[in-house]
Amino acid sequence: MPKESVSPKPPAFLVELLEARSPSGFEDEARAVVAKHVKPKANAYEVDALGSCHATLGLNGSPTLMLAGHIDELGLIIIHIDDKGFLYFDVIGGHDRTMISGRRVSILTKKGEVKGVTGKRAIHLMSASDRRKVPELHQMWIDIGAKDKKEALSRVRIGDPAIYDHAFEPLHGSLAVARAFDDKTGAYAVNEAFLRLAKGRKPVAKVVAVSTSQEEIGVRGATTSAYLADPDVALVVDVSHATDHPDADHRKYGAFTLGGGPILTRGANAHPAVFERLYDCALEAKISVQIEADPRPTGTDARAIQVARAGVPTGIIGIPLRYMHTPSEVIDLNDLENVVRLLVAFARSLKKGEKFS
């Protein structure tokens, strides 16, 4: 019989981040988790005006290394309540509309959590042509069981956000499934690397671990965070598409696998010298990596950090992920651990005052 795959125990810090509800612009719960784990170990800690968390190690170190991963996630926001008490919504971030209906959701209100279900007209009540169409947002709603508008308004306000009610679960072996691995995994990686640097051999660099806000609606947190941190070099950690499923053309998207290791980006948004250092650090640490080519600004915080102030040499590390921007994203926890190890190795490789050019 084949040997049963053993599941690694998920880090408690990661699970707490995933349990935190933090749609873009409403990241309070995720900020609280970061502060709980990281603030006690930081030489300095602050939250900027857009809600990004900055933890600093080595106040007088040089160069300044910024590690960035975003704590916000996709969500919904209530825009209208009809006379029957049904809630209409817009999306926070880039949703696949085919995935919205029939989901359990949690609405985050001032009074607490309100449970709901996303609904639309049943397929039995559609014409043949309508069945082939993707519903528009205004053709879907959230049902909270209210009898009318008055009752709904007593529980929910216009502008309240909502998230899919999907929790972290082990899948098989080292694979796991959750909503918002994009990019709670990246936020976990940069902060866990920070904690290991604080606990072990200190780097000569000043390290600023930034849990950025509002990435999903235009890398807004990274824009202000890069100005505040003023780094000499930056590493951005975000999820990247694993293409090891049945419907991915490797000729278009490249070949990337869960369990294949961190994905390092080459292209205009990634500084060549930073890429080479990451690659060398991976070789030395015996970390398998995958290489991605992207000729344009990426859909990550790197697109903002790279052009902050007078420009920042930036590297991009991807965590392979299946089913991005759905309620059930899948990663390999071993890839995540290797991203943390690579961040630590890069930080410790820096020489005093080193510049990348």
What name fits each language-model region?
Residues 1-357:
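N-terminal hydrophobic/helix-forming segments and targeting peptides
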